[in-house]
Every structure is written in C-alpha cells, then in structure tokens.
Amino acid sequence: MIKVLKKKLIVGLEIGTTKTTISVGEILEDDTINIIGIGLSKSIGIDRGIINDLKSIVECIKKVINQAETMANCNITSIYLALSNKYINCQNEIGIIPILQEEITKNDIENVIHTAKSVRIRNEHKILHIIPQEYSIDERTGIKNPIGLSGIRMQAIVHLITCHSSIKKNIIKAVESCGIRVDYSVFSGLASSESVLTTDERNLGVCIVDIGGGTTDIAIYTNGTLKHSCVIPYAGNTVTNDISYVFNIPFMYAEKIKIKYGYAMQSSDITEEEIKIVNEDNTIIQTFHKDKLTEVIESRYIELLTLINEEIKNTQKKLKKSGRIHKLGAGIVLTGGASNIKLFKNCAEKVFNIPVRIGCPKKNNINTAKLTNNTQTGSLSTVIGLLYFGKKYFYSHRNKNSYNFFKKWLQYINNWIKKEF
C-alpha cells in the first residue's frame, strides 16, 4: 500500500497598485520551499494599497488564484496577505516588569512584551506586528534572549507596526469574497526583507527599499533587528505619470517606453535615438529623443530617492540619540518592480553616498525552477517573502498547538489523579 503524504502548502498574495501576484509553495521534507504555482494579473480597483472598486479587484484576485491553482494542481483555501499603504505606521515602545522568579521564563517574556504593546496607538489603527528588538536586565543592555538569566527588573524595546483597520478590513473582504481565508496579514516591507536580506546584512545594518508601482516600503535593520519601518506613497507610477504628462501620451504608452527605453540617469550609452510612439492603428502619435526621456526619469527618481534618504537619516539620528547602533554597514538594498530600470543602482549611490545593491529573492532554502526570470529582478520579492514568513508561522503555530495539547493532557491526568486518589 502506498502512503500518500498530505502536502504542506503555503500561499502568498500581494495586491499591488500595478499588479496582483500570488505564489504557492510546498514545504518539503528537507525544510526547503518548492514554488509550485504562480499567478500574475494587472491590478484594477486598487491604488496605493487602498481599494476603490471592490468588484474589479475581486476579479483580479480570482484570476490569479485560478492561474496558481492550475499550475500547482491544488485547491487554494487560505493565504498570507501582504499589506502596503500610507496608513501603515510604526513606533518603538518600552515595557518594564519585575523579575519574580530565580530565572527569567517564557512567561516573563510574554508579560514584558504585553506591557510594551499596551500603549495608545493611532485612532482606528490595529497592530499588525510586534517585533522585540532587545532586552535589558537591570544595568545590562542589548540582550537578545534573556530566558534563563537572573535579575531584579527586565525591560523590553519592541517595534510595533500598525495599519488603519478599515483599509485592512476592506482588503481582507476582497480576498474572502473569493472564498479564501486570510491566515495572516504581513507588512510588505517585512515580507521583502525575508526573501532578499541576509542575516549578515541585518547584523551589519541595512535598509531595504521596496519600490513598487504605487508605494515604497522602507525597513531599517541594525544589530540584527528591525528598528524602523514606513511607507512612502510615491513609487514607479509617479515616474510614469511624469512621462505621460511631459510627452502628452497615455499612461499605458508611458509605462511601456519607461520599461523599454528608460534609464535612471544620464550615461554615455544613451544616444539621441528618436523614440516613436505608435498607437494601435500604427499611427505615430508622438516622437522624442531618448536623452530627453532620461532627463524626465532621472529628475523624478532623484526626488524619490532624496525622500527615502531623508527618512533614513532621520531614523539614524534618533537611534544615535538613544545610544543605539545606527550605522548601515551593509548599505542600501533596492528591490521591487520599479528598481529594474537601467542604471538605478548608480543613480541611488549618487544620492545615498553608501554602497547599494539591487536585491532579488535569495536562492537558499527555496526552489524557483518553475518560475520565469521575474525572480531575478525583484518583482516577486514580496510574494516570495510571504512564503518564508508563512513557513515560520506554520511551524510556530504547529508547535504552539502541540504545546497546548500537551498542557491539556497533563491537566487531564492531574485531574484524574486527584479524583481517583
């Protein structure tokens, strides 16, 4: 008799301004993730993470689900959902508790984190993530894992990421309208960090910048933990809008020429080649030179990168003022679809004045053989990161359930012994 093993599937869904993407991963016996399905569709009905046409975005979600189910030969029932919009905020908070036992236990950790998160957050906001940064015991600071240590008082610094509840609720409603359950909502910047950053980069200090169509996600790590996160409501579509306006052409044509001919900065490689915009009837509707196109693109990208640089500098000042590690030894990692434009790394280094690399999903512990070259460009960084995130959640949830079962079983035995003896 052949034993059929149930597949351990994880599904990630990103509903972006320009595209809706879904990925299906299978957790294999060797603990790697094998991507077995993918779905891609142009997004309609959402702008910068906020739904403006529920019916249209539901159709987009259904389309990518059908694509992924066909490719993976599976039935999708639940997903991990990426969130990115200008109403995502972060704050670092402190919790303090007395240490009552000889040694610090897991319960103490839970209590001090609970104290730190029990703060006033913005109206209509709900907490998405609670991320411990470091602990202090009496005068000892910078402790990463205090379990088993002794002391009188423990302090925790945690990073809280929040989202406007109605915006999150509407996106979940769109997913549930497709008959799909949302297992967990994840800030897109965290998901991209999971797929793109290395442990060494987080320890040295790094800032990941995920530039999509409508929003730019920023996450800053020092000493191995997340110190700051935010969303800037400007991204690749802002550049496309400029091209559309300057050359008086439809947005659709502007996006195509940005992808085909675009450079993020001037270069000797750029000639005075004439670009012709042709409509569906093969009629020329506009002509202009490539160097003029580059001029438009470069000015907007420099403006966006300057905004990002100001956010990074302000965060570093706050970290330095509080006596915490603030240097970004590993520099800046750029990812997302809008980072694919030629010479973007060079343009970014001119603004940031520190090392920059273009990040794409890591190849370790994940098999992307079924995917196209999109994985090499960073366009799928978030949706693949959701698979990494989902695997962690899968195991932690399973271990928690096992622990609760064992706890209930012990309680049952204790009650039985008391009753019988």
UniProtKB/Swiss-Prot annotation:
GO terms for cellular component: cell division site; cytoplasmic side of plasma membrane. GO terms for biological process: FtsZ-dependent cytokinesis. It is a peripheral membrane protein. Pfam families: FtsA (PF14450), SHS2_FTSA (PF02491). SMART domains: FtsA. CDD domains: ASKHA_NBD_FtsA. Keywords: Cell cycle, Cell division, Cell membrane, Membrane. It is found in: Cell membrane. Cell division protein that is involved in the assembly of the Z ring. May serve as a membrane anchor for the Z ring. Self-interacts. Interacts with FtsZ. Belongs to the FtsA/MreB family. NCBIfam families: ftsA (TIGR01174), PRK09472.1 (NF007009). This is Cell division protein FtsA. It comes from Buchnera aphidicola subsp. Baizongia pistaciae (strain Bp). The gene is ftsA.
